[in-house]
Amino acid sequence: GGRIKRVSPQRPKVAKSTRVLDLKGKVLMPGLCDGHVHVTALTPDFSALARYSPFYTAARSADVLDGMLMRGFTTVRDAGGADYGLAKAVDEGYMRGPRILFCGKALSQTGGHGDVRAAGENFTFEGCFCCPGLGRIADGVDEMRRAARDEIRKGATQIKLMVSGGVSSPTDRVDSTQFSMDEIIAAVEEAEAANIHVMAHAYTARAVNRAIVGGVRSIEHGNLIDETSVELFVKHGTFYVPTLSTYNAIKAEGLKAGFPPELLSKLDDVLVAGGRALAMAYDGGVKMVYGTDLLGDMHRHQLKEFGLRAKVVSAAELIRSATCNAAELFGMQGEIGTVSVG
């Protein structure tokens, strides 16, 4: 069960008892894929999220997952927060939702995009593995290897690195680079040894280019890339996962949803630039994957990414980004992404 046995323009002969759906005039598509989600991000305030009860977070994630499935998404790649427990609950039918590909905790340097401590907070933060936060700290090559191996031990289907500053982190600049090249390469080596890939949060051309050269498989966001980045994307076969919908959602309703007001000024650095980066990548032939990165109550805008990208990208390329391109990035060709036999 669950497999396509035949694709044909002719209606097959079947027993009278067989259920037949006449979908003439309709379009049959593969299940959609979202290459950048945070199914446990119940609030856009990551400092608050890290203090939530893990049981409360898991319970509320059920609604997030159900909503994704009802929008047509049957596979999602979680970019920090979800672990094997949620993925297993969905696989075993205890929660209704899409298949979850998870990284566990995203890896961040001290003071990086995954470090949720404010400047005046001096407690030790190791990403407390029982808490619902999205990240964990790793400084230096040895810690990077240990952290990557630990997430792999817990079943991660990809490793997530924070290689630049971000909008939602309290103490870094969007234009900062994070992790040394040796640290990036160490994580990539550990992922490759386990036959999985690395996804990297990065905004500026400098951060993006370092990550691509270091061997990551996909760049997340990339709003501030330049032509040198496009050349590297194509040369290395790296995938690009823009996330335009989250910036528009935060701009429109972020404060109401709980986004920290002191961080809202960072949004201007990337909001308008996202469309330019998308056009640059599309014109340059970069292979792109659909992603949204929505948080809290803003998850309901998941389908709006299509409309935002449609201003730049062809309809055919949009569909590929959410189907066959995603399947290739995930290493799941033949399993998802196409309507084909098998």
Regions found by a protein language model. Give the residues of each.
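Metal-associated gating/positioning segment near the N- to mid-region
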Residues: L23-E92, Q109-A118, D182, R206, ...
